[in-house]
């Protein structure tokens, strides 16, 4: 296969940076669904530095799926590792460079002490490979936060962070300068960590010593296990001025400043010692203001002093200026000195201790305090002359009070008797009393009723809205706003009952009819074949709306069915507008958004109402998915005004239609339904189609918020789950919709998945694939992975039962489940299940059921009078059959000669008029029947080609070859008089029109080839060297790995290269030159018929990335047309012309679309009456006969090719030359005042008001070698991300107008369409939305640019790992990848043998091993033929043994190899239990060559 590509220019080699497939894939619609945007907390750059403004969480589990770096704030005594307790965790997502510089605003008013030399200690423990790069990522985030002035100088700072499975915390006493800590201590730790050995389970740094008090202590700790208990324990030690001991440690000396004197110097100042050494510098003896306050006392009361962190009785006595004996006398309680608490008041003289307890306020409310980072009931009580029991008693009615065991940071609590306070605001609260800006109510007992949720949804104790048990279960433990551990509780609109309303007079049975079904390969239904007795309402889906709000039905088959639809009797005939594709495709999504606005709603409503009235229909159904939706992939977020606009539009529409029916479709998820003012809408319209199907599907993959109890959204769940359907019915009826107006969705199709494990088919078992790509088997007719009709399911059950492994009713979901071909799992509803559901919905007072869709239920024979479905479809597309009820017609085309007015050489009429008057449609129908009869017979000699046989039947010349372009082609223009037309010839004047159409189609393809292989080839060949010199100083290697990327580009380029040319060509043809609706319809249908097939050919060329799949046969066929880069499209269109005239049913269908109604023949745009014939123009025969492209046609192809070529090739060449371009998501808005600081060295672009940068991790992230020999003494900056070579030229003035912004925005759109994840597939040009966007030369179409996108934090972590593990650079998506640990083995080819028993290790323990080593540089070098247990946690051990020396003495395995195996087995083994065990064999690196390695997972 190599010779095919040898010699091809580097510019053609396409990068892995191009498009993602199934555009606008559906999104989740289950009641619990939340968008991908909710996986991580709000960005730090948005929330600001104050933790109380960050997102709030009640446990760490809700943050486990965020793969970004996060900063946390929580109380020191809040044990956040305790999964059985309730917590308050403040969190924000750190992208890198999140903090503005506010350091000057915190400069203390008092002059700092002079500079001191101090000793910093770095300590660590070593057990297994470490993650210094993750450590550094968190240190950098904390350093920036501290150094830029975001800690208060008036109080001790405690801050926490997490990145992946690395946790960290920083403690800074309030007498230390934050700038010193950030720029000296933490920066030195970052620098030194580059030289660590990669084996640190924990890393700690402290400034602490025997003479330090807690105000002068600094500490940092990072752990590799992702927990915080040890960090909080360290903070408690430092807050008591207790230093930590380490297994290993080193020290370095640096300078710092103290903003107040240490207690040790104060003690010395009150004795005979003049000073004491602390950190190597004499500290002056001086009493601070803080230490001297409260020394004066009133009569009868003692003078007091306040206990500081780390104090002793001796230290306090010194500050009091009294002896130890006197201090003991004044404070004589037993064991007094062993029970000192920070904040506690003590006596410094004789007398009674004053009462410092606060008093209630004048209005009767209690005195309050806000709980600080390091405060507990104990410290608060001590500071206020109270006991813990007092605190607990005061707060029995305080919002959120759960007792002293676990008080939360920033809580407002009572420290006196009195009525409870207003709770503290929570920045992201949506409901309840903690919504920012909430005013104090008159009745404090009604706090829970404040700020109710939209749709009357449940409000949990954290102020979040939802409709599932997680939000709606009240687990109050006493005080208002509390919940039991492990729950979120509920404070308002609790419960999940369905509100039963007024049942309808007649229970509705609604059916949807898919008018677009005839685009399938099989499974058809004429609308007359619908069992009308089953339905009260029949919805015809869908009718088109243009961008100027005109109504039409553009598809001929749909138009034919619509005419039949108008004649049905029985059910109400409802016409539907919208649908998922219409609502979400780039070309149409704005129609509803703008059409319902105040400026346009009257026009849109009037046009729809007129269409309904003119066609004598019974009503209209609007399916907008969805107003105000925040996260439709590839689309800007919907505006919040859209819901009310929709309501106002429906009011106008209903007023215009009067007694006729108006309905809408609505989603079953709170996430999307909250954009609808659904209660108000329900009062305007007649009923709501409630879409309780598609609750789940492939789109759930990767979203932890899509499926209850499923951490990654990839569990096998029914799309018609009964439990979730009831939750949805509760949602909509609680929202205020009368149940009698709710028509509940049922389905006649299933959603299918490819199972991970053939033996695991329950709701916790997993499926494979990504959100945009299903591995489920496609059925023949629906032809969509993940989607299969009931008809196809029943066909399997009835006629292919040997393929069915399981078939049963799942009682929990009340769904039919079928497993077939071992690993295909599908959930669906049989007629029996639908009948059960119908009875239940009737009992609940619902308004009816709606079935999607009638045409999916069973296979139907072609209607009476039609031979078969292909024949009927062909006739529908040709327009030769008249809808039933309009009368029959007979053809007369053979009776019309060349002298007919409509057949003269100079056309006097429009193409459509000529076609119809000469009965060309009848001629075409007869010719096709004759051809099929000829085609299907056995022939002894050579069979004529399709075009040759048609010519023969028409009386034309022989040796015709319209299906070829090369030198052997022959498809001439033939005038009417040259055909053998006359009595008995079975031909007529229509022959010329049909043959003119053939010629025009052949001419178009020939001109395209002419332009492609001559002019464009010359241009590209002349500019390739400039491309390479500008963007790639090092040429790419010539290897087979590029094959898939080249073919991706060929596939992508079809609509861009061919589309523009054909678009221009068609617009010159008379039938498509006017701006009329008919002309536009002709243009759209012909363009689709021409280009859909080449796009399919191009897509099918891609195959797989295995070079062995590129067979010699494929190569030979492809090589005939591919010599240079342009020949890819030359082959595609040459092959497509061959297919177009091959005489198969599919080709005939395409030709019928192209030539029907005279779309390819001559004529004038509009008929002119005969007397005005002098105004008519004669046709130019010479121009019509040319097959060489004109200059303008060459320019059209050149523009399309070069735009696609440069846009695709430039990122490809960067990558081919060893660079790794990626997009930095700065997290900043485009109007951020500090944004320019981060864009001065890198090219940037804005998308949806967010700033992104194009960057390259060139070279080493930290290129320094340490040779100074002093820990902490080496200053070496990290490398900055680089710009890409030649990027300055991408300013839109060259390279076909390509701009840096196009590369950035295109990559970001791809990333967003893939659910904010990298790695989405290449674009599918057979998708109509993608095709149209590419045809418009939109190189930012999602997927065309596929550079990875991530935060600077993640990118730098991967970059640093690559310094030590070069293979990391070869990982997909580098540097935005997470799987960048060291690897030596081919885990993808490992064998897996499960041996799970009741005594096997816990899966969770094995996954902790993953947490501990994921992304690390860890590796093991072990002797062969010896068993080793190399990774352990809890009950789980991962062991290895090299087998058979094969010249090796040692074998290597890396951390990533272990991670890959444990991840795979944790998904495939255990079968729903919590344990797993087993073994396998794989190939790994030996010290000489590849080595067989046996691995095992077993109990320790």
Swiss-Prot record:
Residues 1169-1193 have a biased composition (Basic and acidic residues). Disruption phenotype: Leads to a decreased expansion rate of decayed lesion on infected fruits. Residues 507-879 form the GH18 domain. Residues 303-348, 367-415 form the LysM domain. Its EC number is 3.2.1.14. InterPro entries: Chitin-bd_1, Chitinase_II/V-like_cat, Chitinase_insertion_sf, Ecp2-like, Endochitinase-like_sf, Glyco_hydro18_cat, Glyco_hydro_18_chit_AS, Glycoside_hydrolase_SF. Residues 1-23 form the signal peptide. Residues 1164-1193 are annotated as: Disordered. It is found in: Secreted. One of its GO terms (molecular function) is chitin binding. PROSITE patterns: CHIT_BIND_I_2, GH18_1, GH18_2, LYSM. Keywords: Carbohydrate metabolism, Chitin degradation, Chitin-binding, Disulfide bond, Glycoprotein, Glycosidase, Hydrolase, Polysaccharide degradation, Repeat, Secreted, Signal, Virulence. Residues 428-496 form the Chitin-binding type-1 domain. Pfam families: Chitin_bind_1 (PF00187), Glyco_hydro_18 (PF00704), Hce2 (PF14856), LysM (PF01476). The keyword Lipoprotein does not apply. Gene3D superfamilies: 3.10.50.10, Endochitinase-like, Glycosidases, LysM domain. GO terms for cellular component: extracellular region. Glycans are attached at residues 53, 225, 251, 270, 721, 800, 892, 983. Chitin binds at residues 626, 852. CDD domains: ChtBD1 (cd00035), GH18_zymocin_alpha (cd02878), LysM (cd00118). Secreted chitinase involved in the degradation of chitin, a component of the cell walls of fungi and exoskeletal elements of some animals (including worms and arthropods). Involved in pathogenesis via manipulation of host defenses for successful infection. In plants, chitin acts as a microbe-associated molecular pattern (MAMP) that is recognized by lysin motif (LysM)-containing plant cell surface-localized pattern recognition receptors (PRRs) that activate a plethora of downstream immune responses. The LysM (lysin motif) domains are small globular domains involved in binding chitin in eukaryotes. LysM12 contains one LysM domains. Belongs to the glycosyl hydrolase 18 family. Chitinase class V subfamily. This is Secreted chitinase LysM12.
């Amino acid at each position: 296969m190599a010779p095919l590509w040898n010699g091809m220019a580097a510019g053609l080699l396409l990068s892995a940076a191009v498009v993602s497939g199934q555009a606008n894939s559906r999104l989740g619609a289950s009641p619990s669904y939340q968008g991908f945007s909710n996986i991580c907390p709000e960005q730090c750059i948005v929330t600001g530095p104050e933790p109380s403004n960050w997102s709030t969480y009640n446990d760490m589990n809700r943050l486990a799926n965020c793969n970004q770096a996060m900063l946390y704030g929580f109380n020191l005594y809040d044990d956040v590792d305790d999964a059985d307790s309730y917590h308050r965790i403040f969190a924000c997502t750190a992208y890198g460079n999140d903090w503005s510089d506010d350091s000057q605003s915190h400069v203390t008013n008092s002059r700092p002490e002079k500079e001191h030399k101090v000793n910093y200690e770095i300590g660590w423990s070593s057990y297994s490979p470490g993650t210094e790069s993750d450590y550094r990522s968190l240190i950098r985030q904390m350093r920036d936060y501290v150094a830029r002035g975001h800690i208060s100088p008036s109080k001790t700072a405690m801050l926490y962070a997490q990145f992946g499975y690395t946790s960290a915390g920083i403690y800074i006493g309030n007498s230390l300068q934050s700038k010193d800590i950030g720029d000296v201590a933490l920066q030195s730790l970052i620098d030194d960590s580059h030289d660590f050995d990669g084996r640190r389970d924990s890393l700690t740094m402290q400034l602490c010593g025997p003479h330090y008090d807690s105000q002068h202590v600094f500490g940092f700790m990072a752990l590799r296990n992702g927990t915080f208990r040890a960090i909080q324990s360290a903070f408690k030690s430092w807050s008591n001025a207790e230093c930590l001991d380490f297994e290993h440690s080193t020290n370095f000396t640096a300078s710092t400043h103290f903003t107040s004197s240490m207690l040790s110097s104060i003690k010395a100042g009150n004795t005979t010692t003049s000073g004491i050494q602390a950190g190597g510098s004499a500290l002056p003896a001086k009493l601070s203001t803080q230490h001297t306050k409260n020394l004066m006392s009133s009569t009868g009361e003692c003078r007091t002093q306040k206990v500081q962190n780390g104090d002793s009785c001796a230290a306090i006595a010194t500050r009091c200026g009294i002896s130890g004996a006197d201090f003991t006398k004044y404070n004589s309680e037993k064991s007094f000195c062993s029970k000192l608490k920070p904040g506690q008041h003590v006596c410094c003289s004789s007398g009674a201790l004053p009462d410092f307890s606060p008093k209630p306020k004048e209005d009767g409310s209690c005195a309050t305090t806000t709980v600080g980072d390091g405060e507990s009931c104990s410290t608060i009580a001590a500071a206020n002359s109270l006991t813990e029991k007092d605190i607990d008693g005061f707060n029995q009615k305080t919002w959120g009070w759960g007792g002293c065991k676990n008080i939360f940071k920033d809580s407002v609590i009572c420290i006196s008797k009195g009525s409870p306070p207003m709770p503290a605001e929570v920045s992201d609260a949506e409901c309840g009393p903690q919504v920012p800006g909430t005013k104090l109510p008159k009745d404090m007992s009604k706090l829970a009723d404040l700020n109710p949720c939209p749709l009357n949804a449940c409000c949990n104790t954290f102020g979040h809205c939802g409709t599932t048990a997680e939000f709606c279960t009240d687990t109050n433990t006493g005080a208002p706003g509390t919940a039991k551990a492990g729950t979120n509780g509920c404070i308002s609109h609790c419960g999940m009952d369905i509100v039963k309303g007024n049942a309808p007079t007649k229970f509705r049975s609604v059916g949807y009819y898919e008018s677009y079904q005839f685009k399938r390969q099989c499974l058809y239904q004429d609308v007359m074949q619908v069992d009308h007795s089953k339905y009260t309402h029949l919805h015809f889906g869908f009718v088109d709306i243009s961008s100027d709000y005109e109504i039409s039905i553009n598809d001929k088959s749909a138009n034919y069915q619509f005419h039949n639809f108008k004649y049905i009797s029985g059910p109400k005939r409802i016409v539907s507008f919208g649908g998922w594709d219409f609502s979400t495709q780039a070309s149409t999504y704005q129609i509803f958004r703008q059409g319902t606005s105040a400026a346009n709603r009257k026009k849109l409503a009037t046009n729809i109402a007129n269409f309904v009235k003119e066609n004598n229909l019974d009503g209209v159904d609007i399916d907008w998915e969805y107003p105000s939706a925040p996260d439709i992939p590839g689309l800007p977020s919907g505006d919040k005004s859209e819901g009310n606009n929709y309501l106002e539009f429906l009011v106008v529409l209903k007023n215009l239609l009067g007694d006729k029916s108006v309905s809408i479709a609505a989603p079953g998820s709170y996430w999307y339904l909250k954009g609808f003012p659904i209660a108000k809408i329900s009062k305007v319209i007649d009923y709501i189609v409630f879409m309780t199907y598609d609750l789940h599907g492939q789109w759930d993959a990767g979203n932890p918020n899509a499926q209850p109890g499923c951490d990654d959204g990839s569990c096998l769940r029914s799309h018609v789950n009964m439990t979730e359907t009831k939750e949805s019915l509760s949602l909509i009826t609680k929202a205020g919709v009368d149940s009698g107006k709710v028509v509940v969705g049922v389905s006649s199709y299933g959603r299918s998945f490819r199972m991970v494990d053939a033996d695991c088919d329950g709701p916790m078992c997993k499926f494979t694939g990504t959100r945009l790509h299903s591995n489920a088997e496609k059925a023949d007719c629906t032809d969509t992975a993940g989607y299969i009709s009931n008809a196809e399911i029943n066909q399997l059950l009835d006629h292919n039962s040997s393929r069915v492994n399981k078939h049963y009713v799942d009682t929990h979901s009340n769904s039919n489940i079928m497993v077939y071909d071992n690993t295909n799992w599908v959930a669906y509803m049989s007629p029996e299940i639908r009948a059960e559901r119908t009875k239940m919905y009737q009992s609940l007072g619902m308004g009816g059921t709606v079935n999607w869709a009638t045409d999916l239920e069973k296979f139907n024979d072609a209607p009476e009078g039609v031979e078969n479905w292909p024949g009927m479809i062909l006739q529908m597309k040709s327009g030769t059959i008249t809808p039933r009820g309009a009368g029959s017609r007979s053809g007369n085309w053979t009776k019309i000669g060349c002298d007919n007015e409509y057949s003269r050489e100079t056309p006097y009429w429009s193409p459509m008029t000529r076609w119809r008057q000469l009965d060309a449609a009848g001629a075409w129908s007869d010719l096709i029947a004759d051809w099929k009869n000829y085609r299907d017979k056995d022939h002894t000699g050579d069979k004529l080609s399709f075009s040759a046989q048609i010519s023969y039947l028409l009386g034309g010349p022989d040796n015709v070859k319209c299906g070829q372009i090369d030198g052997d082609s022959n498809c001439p223009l033939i005038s009417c008089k040259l055909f053998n037309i006359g009595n008995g010839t079975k031909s007529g004047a229509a022959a010329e029109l049909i043959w003119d159409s053939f010629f025009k189609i052949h001419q178009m393809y020939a001109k395209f080839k002419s332009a492609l292989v001559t002019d464009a080839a010359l241009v590209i060949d002349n500019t390739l060297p400039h491309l390479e010199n500008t963007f790639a100083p090092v040429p790419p290697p010539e290897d087979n790995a590029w094959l898939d990327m080249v073919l991706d580009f060929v596939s992508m380029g079809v609509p861009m290269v061919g589309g523009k040319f054909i678009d221009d060509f068609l617009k010159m043809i008379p039938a498509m030159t006017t701006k009329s609706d008919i002309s536009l319809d002709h243009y759209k249908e012909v363009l689709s018929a021409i280009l859909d097939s080449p796009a399919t050919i191009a897509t099918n060329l891609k195959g797989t990335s295995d070079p062995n799949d590129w067979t010699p046969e494929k190569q030979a066929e492809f090589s005939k047309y591919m010599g240079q880069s342009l020949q890819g499209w030359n082959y595609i269109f040459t092959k497509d012309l061959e297919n177009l005239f091959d005489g198969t049913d599919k080709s005939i269908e395409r030709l019928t679309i192209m030539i029907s109604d005279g779309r390819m023949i001559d004529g004038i745009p509009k008929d002119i009456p005969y007397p005005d014939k002098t105004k008519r123009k004669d046709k130019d025969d010479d121009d019509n006969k040319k097959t060489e492209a004109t200059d303008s046609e060459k320019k059209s192809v050149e523009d399309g090719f070069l735009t696609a070529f440069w846009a695709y090739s430039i990122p490809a060449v960067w990558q081919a030359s060893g660079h790794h371009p990626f997009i930095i998501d700065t997290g900043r808005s485009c109007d951020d005042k500090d944004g320019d600081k981060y864009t001065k060295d890198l090219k940037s672009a804005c998308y949806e008001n967010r700033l992104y940068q194009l960057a390259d991790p060139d070279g080493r992230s930290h290129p320094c070698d340490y040779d100074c020999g002093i820990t902490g003494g080496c200053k070496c900056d990290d490398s900055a991300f680089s710009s890409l070579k030649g990027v300055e030229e991408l300013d839109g003035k060259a390279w076909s107008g390509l701009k840096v912004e196009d590369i950035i925005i295109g990559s970001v759109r791809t990333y967003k369409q893939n659910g904010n994840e990298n790695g989405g597939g290449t674009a599918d040009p057979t998708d109509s939305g993608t095709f149209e966007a590419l045809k418009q030369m939109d190189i930012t179409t999602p997927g065309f640019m596929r550079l990875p996108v991530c935060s600077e934090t993640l990118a730098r972590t991967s970059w640093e790992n690559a310094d030590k593990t070069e293979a990391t650079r070869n990982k997909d998506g580098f540097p935005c990848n997470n799987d960048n640990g060291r690897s030596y083995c081919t885990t993808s080819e490992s064998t897996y043998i499960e041996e799970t028993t009741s005594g096997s290790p816990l899966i969770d323990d094995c996954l902790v091993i993953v947490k501990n080593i994921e992304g690390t540089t860890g590796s093991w070098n072990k002797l062969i033929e010896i068993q080793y247990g190399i990774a352990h946690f809890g009950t789980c051990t991962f062991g290895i043994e090299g087998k058979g020396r094969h010249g090796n003495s040692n074998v290597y395995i890396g951390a990533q190899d272990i991670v890959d195996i444990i991840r795979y087995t944790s998904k495939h083994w255990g079968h729903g239990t919590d344990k797993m065990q087993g073994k396998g064999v794989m190939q790994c690196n030996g010290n000489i060559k590849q080595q067989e390695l046996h691995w095992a997972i077993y109990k320790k």
